[in-house]
Amino acid sequence: MINIAIDAMGGDFGEKPIIEGVLKALEAKPFNAILVGNSKILKPLIPKKLEQYIQYEEANEIFSMNENATDALKNKETTIYKAINLLKEKKVDAVVSAGHSGASMSLATLRLGRLKGISRPAIATLMPNIVSKTLLLDVGANTDCKAENLFQFAIMGEVYAREIMQIQKPRLALLSNGEEECKGNELTKESHQLMKKIPNFIGNAEGRDIFNGEIDVLVCDGFDGNVILKACEGVATAIFQLLKNEVKRSFISKIGALLIKPSFKKLKKHTDWQEYGGAPLLGVNGCVIISHGKSDSRAIKNAIFQAVNFSQSHINELIENELGKYNA
């Protein structure tokens, strides 16, 4: 059975939504949950019927969102440090944390190490498109990149799309300010030339192409990726709020809204980041899923499902093998 370490107290809202998410996940599929935190606080939240799937790793300190990520290595008593350490010692198969994302990345990179051939790990996240989903990476791990980094991100993203998203030949593109090969800055142009070696590379793509369903994996540096991610979150929230405002304007609008309510629910579910749970940190020697600090129980549940699927695959081995083809 898969063993998942969960940073049980690291999110913005404390342990309650995290534990609720763990319980929902356990009701859907069996796995062993190692809750990292204060067991005196956590144990009363666990129903007896699920106690057999729960273990505890004592940790009484939380790495604050206000702390600098570079300080994560100094305090070995925090929940995130102990969770990552369990993975390093191979006592668990994966880690899920809604705590300080910078600390998670720093600890995972320095404690677990990088995969062979990877110079920098990347955070990958799923973005909804009109057909299914697009994998976008990097979305925050590396604000400054070299062309070789983006090439490695491309390989990692392609393997993830093939193994986890079950896309046999994932269409891979590079984010730029135009589709033409000559467009972009020096980083984009150099990266484009490297990515041409990859058979599934379809060229440059613009920001709007994320949503047209014609790209499976889109590669960019962590600065651009994070800006895109946060902008999309804001746009989605604004659109749904505007729709709510318009519906309230007249009786006819309210009747119309009732008629299409099921469609709106499906749309909201498709565009809701909580449905995707978390973002895998690709390129480290292990499985680390980084969840949003504001994750509710549904997001935690889905992040755990991601961790289970990742752990049941051989994705890290496949990434190293794929990179080896180009480095030989």
UniProtKB/Swiss-Prot annotation:
The keyword Transport does not apply. GO terms for molecular function: phosphate:acyl-[acyl carrier protein] acyltransferase activity. It catalyses: a fatty acyl-[ACP] + phosphate = an acyl phosphate + holo-[ACP]. GO terms for cellular component: cytoplasm. Its EC number is 2.3.1.274. It is found in: Cytoplasm. Pathway: Lipid metabolism; phospholipid metabolism. GO terms for biological process: fatty acid biosynthetic process; phospholipid biosynthetic process. Keywords: Cytoplasm, Lipid biosynthesis, Lipid metabolism, Phospholipid biosynthesis, Phospholipid metabolism, Transferase. Disulfide bonds: none annotated. It is an enzyme of class 2 (transferase). Catalyzes the reversible formation of acyl-phosphate (acyl-PO(4)) from acyl-[acyl-carrier-protein] (acyl-ACP). This enzyme utilizes acyl-ACP as fatty acyl donor, but not acyl-CoA. Homodimer. Probably interacts with PlsY. Belongs to the PlsX family. This is Phosphate acyltransferase. It comes from Campylobacter jejuni subsp. doylei (strain ATCC BAA-1458 / RM4099 / 269.97). The gene is plsX.
